[in-house]
A protein has these predicted regions:
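Long, highly charged low-complexity segments enriched in Glu/Asp and Lys/Arg with interspersed Ser/Thr
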Residues: 124-162
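Charged, amphipathic alpha-helical linker/scaffold segments
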Residues: 61-124
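Arginine residue identity/basic-tract feature
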Residues: 16, 80, 101-102, 128, ...
């Protein structure tokens, strides 16, 4: 994912690298920085032409990282929904966006915590539901709600514990 320029710790680092590369290498280097960080290639062009002063913002940098990680993990279904929810949290809270961008924080580890919590909270479904689904009882399930996911995400990325 971060092959040429490495993983950046913040949107500021991305912007500093982009400014340095603009002076040295030009558009192709900026496009590589954008690609490695999940940023829009058009933003790279706009940055190079001076249409925008910075390549990225806190929320765009966080969402770009999440998108790259989700693609790398081939997330679909509920896990993709959870990723979208984390992106929404980044748009609502700059502190969250900054935390998601930090080195060492990963969507993989956050998803693992959500799944672990879900597994630990599993409950047996009523046998009538299980049978109506054509399955054999007993069946245990746990699907965390948004409030629970938000709590886990905030704890993982921000260190906040309720």
């Amino acid at each position: 994912m971060f092959d040429k320029f490495g993983e950046f710790d913040s949107y500021e680092e991305i912007n500093r690298a982009a400014k340095a590369q603009l002076e040295e290498e030009g558009l192709e280097a900026i496009k590589t920085i954008a690609e490695e960080n999940g940023l829009d290639p058009e933003d790279a062009e706009d940055f190079c032409t001076g249409a925008i002063e910075e390549l990225t913002t806190p929320s765009l940098a966080a969402m770009g990282k999440l998108e790259l990680e989700a693609k790398d993990l081939s997330l679909t279904g509920a896990l993709r929904d959870w990723t979208d929810f984390i992106e929404q949290l980044c748009l609502e809270d700059e502190k969250m966006a900054l935390a998601v961008r930090r080195k060492g924080k990963s969507l993989k580890d956050c998803m693992a915590l959500i799944l672990k919590n879900a597994f630990n909270d599993k409950a047996q479904l009523d046998d009538r539901i299980t049978k109506a689904a054509g399955l054999t009882p007993p069946l245990y399930i746990s699907i965390p709600g948004k409030a629970q996911i938000k709590e886990i995400v905030r704890e993982y990325y921000l260190g906040e514990k309720k």
